């Protein structure tokens, strides 16, 4: 475990509610993981036949399973980041983190709909929601200060 150096009353509040600068690394990791997920989704879209009746997924089913597992991990990570951002009371991180978590939940629902029906619009929902989440994590990286030395310290 790591500790936060507490020098004054403002630092005590940051330590109690979580330092928002620590959210940057999680947002960066989720954004990179989302790019991998996006690439897996493209492979599934191009090379895996998803039948409407679930008769069989062909030889590309391992990529489809990996895509689903990565999606579940992303949802867990995004919800964790959203909870931590809200708890840290850093509005500049909380709003995009919650938005990204909701977008990934909608993407998962689109994925389940696509598996059940084969409707192309559900695949589009997944891609657009992934893009929204990537943008939200980029916004967190832009808005939050880095972990390096801060001005005035």
PLM ranges: what are they?
Residues 2-153:
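Polytopic transmembrane helical bundles with strong interfacial aromatic enrichment
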């Amino acid at each position: 475990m790591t500790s936060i150096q507490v020098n004054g009353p403002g630092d005590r509040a940051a330590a109690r509610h979580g330092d928002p600068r620590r959210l940057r690394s999680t947002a960066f990791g989720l954004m990179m993981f989302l790019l991998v997920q996006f690439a897996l989704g493209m492979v599934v879209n191009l090379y895996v036949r998803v039948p409407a009746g679930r008769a069989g997924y062909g030889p590309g089913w391992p990529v489809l399973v990996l895509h689903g597992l990565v999606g579940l991990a992303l949802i867990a990570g995004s919800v964790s980041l959203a909870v931590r951002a809200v708890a840290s009371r850093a509005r500049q991180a909380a709003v995009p983190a919650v938005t990204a978590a909701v977008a990934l939940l909608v993407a998962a629902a689109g994925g389940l709909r696509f598996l059940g029906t084969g409707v192309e619009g559900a695949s589009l929902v997944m891609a657009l929601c992934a893009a929204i989440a990537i943008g939200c994590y980029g916004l967190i990286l832009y808005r939050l200060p880095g972990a390096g030395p801060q001005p005035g310290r």
